């Protein structure tokens, strides 16, 4: 690093800068993002942490494949408005992995319908 006058940056910061994330969320009312697994490790550098840090008080809904820990406590400690898991109680992990795209699509439709109904008078 010292030989090339390079600078170390977090991968998520590099990516968010490349896609002009801050500019794109400037007028956002809500951010919907995803993370494979949400647990106490998020605060130590998972990609979603960079999104949370840049959200600037914009509500964030996180879609996740797996949650480890108390849902309410995780949401509050991380600064997330809501955490929605794609896997339902009793769903086998092998089924969830095999059908991830359909489950994500169905989950996204549910979130869109919720936002539409909540904001119908906004």
List each language-model region with its residue ranges.
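N-terminal loops that bind phosphate or other acidic moieties
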Residues: 1-122
């Amino acid at each position: 690093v010292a030989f090339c006058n390079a600078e170390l940056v977090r991968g998520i910061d590099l990516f968010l800068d490349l896609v002009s994330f801050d500019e794109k969320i400037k007028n956002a009312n809500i951010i919907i993002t995803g993370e494979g697994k949400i647990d106490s490790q998020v605060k130590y550098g998972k990609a979603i942490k960079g999104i949370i840090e840049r959200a600037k008080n914009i509500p964030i809904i996180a879609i996740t494949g797996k949650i480890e820990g108390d849902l309410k406590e995780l949401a509050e400690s991380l600064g997330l408005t809501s955490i929605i898991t794609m896997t339902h109680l009793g769903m086998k992990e092998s089924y969830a992995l095999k059908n991830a795209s359909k489950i994500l699509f169905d989950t996204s439709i549910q979130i869109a319908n919720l936002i539409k109904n909540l904001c119908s008078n906004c």
